[in-house]
A protein has these predicted regions:
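Gly/Pro-rich hinge or "lid" segments in bacterial periplasmic/extracellular proteins
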Residues: 8-12, 19-21, 30, 37, ...
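Extracytoplasmic/peripheral linker and loop segments enriched in polar/acidic and small residues
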Residues: 18-28, 160, 261-274, 301-368, ...
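Alpha-helical secondary-structure segments
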Residues: 30-34, 80, 109-111, 129, ...
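Alpha-to-beta junction loops
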Residues: 31-33, 123, 128-137, 254, ...
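Extracellular/periplasmic solute-recognition and catalytic clefts
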Residues: 84-94, 111-149, 173-174, 182
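Ligand/substrate-recognition segments at binding pockets and active sites
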Residues: 88, 212, 218-292, 363
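Structural transition elements
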Residues: 181-221, 242-245
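Long beta-strand-rich cores associated with HINT superfamily self-processing modules
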Residues: 365-392
Length: 392
């Protein structure tokens, strides 16, 4: 993120070319922080509201050391609330009003209880019983098809076959029919618009389709090219995602039905373990989700550049990299031209079938009618309690 913000020397420091952190384009004097950029970055204002760019109190960070941020007690706060009773893993804790917050006089709520409820049905029942005021009914991730250590996944025709054998409408209906929609491109709908008002998601959509006959033909040809008569793949997904099991079951069923010779196994691990497996390329196919950090295309297209830390499948394309770089540099101040660059990048992903967009996650929630001022965002911080309150 520091590199994509055009922060001076961030890329060279991350790569190790520069060791002196004082050369990073950030200086602090008193209560003023100054950032020096190498080129225009329209989305930089969004970065400044993101936690990665929040200044930390050096003396406290050094005092706490490796325990910094691991529990509510090992953290200091500058926002509207303090976190209480969080031990690093428990699913229920409190947000307590911070009297030192700069706008505390307008924060009406003294405390907020946050509780993790894994089962949607349980959340609904608790809502009906008055135990909670707001419930998100579903949450899941999008399937992400990548090259791994399996030889067959280095074959373009096999990857294309998997994409063509993915019934996106069926997955949504079977697993996440709570406001989610079938994916058409990498960026979700309503993330950003072109100057003419067209949705970026629709504009960049390269034409993903569900075509089992074409998928079967390509799969057969691909197997012949790699010298195999059959293929076994494992799909890795989050064990703590309420919809992941249904999604994986549906994909397994449709893939095996459409592609004779394919056997799909399921592997469910914790969210933390899934991240580790993805980072270490310990997967064949992994369900992977991403929420945008800000309302602009680079928050998604930055994922698949050759050197991106989130490019778990090690996809590499000069065409993709060049298009992305052009969008965030030369065309950064020209939204229409940047959209064309993103469309070029999307086509590179589509042509090589290095990933498989399945659905855009949408959430429906139950909210107490007495709860006012609660803000929900589509990017960045999902829920903002700053000015939320309950009426009598």
């Amino acid at each position: 993120m520091a590199t994509e913000s055009h922060l001076l020397n961030a890329d060279k420091i991350n790569s190790g070319d520069i060791k002196d952190l004082n050369k990073l384009g950030v200086t602090a004097k008193g209560n003023q922080v100054t950032f020096k950029l190498t080129s225009p970055c329209p989305q930089f204002k969004y970065y400044l509201a993101f936690s990665n760019f929040m200044p930390q109190k050096q003396s406290y960070v050094e005092k706490v050391g490796k325990d910094y941020g691991t529990t509510s007690k090992n953290q200091i706060y500058s926002g509207p609330y303090l976190v209480k009773d969080w031990n690093g893993s428990n699913g229920k804790f409190k947000l307590v009003k911070n009297k030192y917050y700069w706008d505390s006089k307008h924060v009406k709520t003294n405390s907020v209880i946050v509780q993790t409820i894994k089962k949607p049905d349980t959340a609904v029942q608790m809502y009906k019983q008055g135990q909670i005021d707001f419930a998100e009914i579903s949450g899941t991730s999008a399937i992400y098809n990548q090259t791994g250590s399996v030889k067959a996944l280095t074959n373009q025709k096999i990857r294309q076959a998997l994409n063509l054998a993915t019934d996106r409408k069926g997955v949504v209906k079977a697993a996440v029919d709570t406001g989610s929609t079938p994916a058409e491109s990498l960026v979700p709908k309503k993330l950003a618009k072109l100057p003419n008002g067209e949705d970026l998601s629709k504009y960049t959509a390269p034409g993903y389709t569900y075509n089992t006959s074409k998928a079967q033909k390509l799969f057969k040809e691909g197997l012949a090219e790699v010298g195999q008569s059959s293929l076994k793949l494992t799909i890795t997904a989050d064990s703590d995602s309420p919809a992941a099991k249904n999604a994986v079951d549906y994909v397994k069923s449709t893939w095996e039905s459409a592609l004779p010779g394919l056997t799909v196994e399921e592997k469910f691990v914790t969210f933390k373990q899934r991240l580790e497996d993805a980072k270490n390329e310990n997967f064949d196919v992994v369900l992977f989700s991403w929420g945008g950090d800000y309302p602009e295309g680079s928050t998604f297209y930055g994922l698949f550049t050759t050197n991106s830390a989130y490019n778990y499948g090690k996809f590499s394309s000069k065409e993709y990299d060049n298009a992305y770089q052009k969008a965030i540099t030369t065309d950064a101040l020209k939204p229409g031209d940047a959209a064309n660059d993103y469309k070029t990048a999307e086509k590179a992903l589509f042509d090589q079938s290095y990933y498989n967009p399945v659905y855009y996650l949408g959430k429906k929630g139950l909210q107490n009618s007495k709860l006012k001022g609660l803000v929900r965002n589509s990017t960045g911080l999902n829920v903002d309690f700053t000015y939320a309150y309950k009426t009598e």
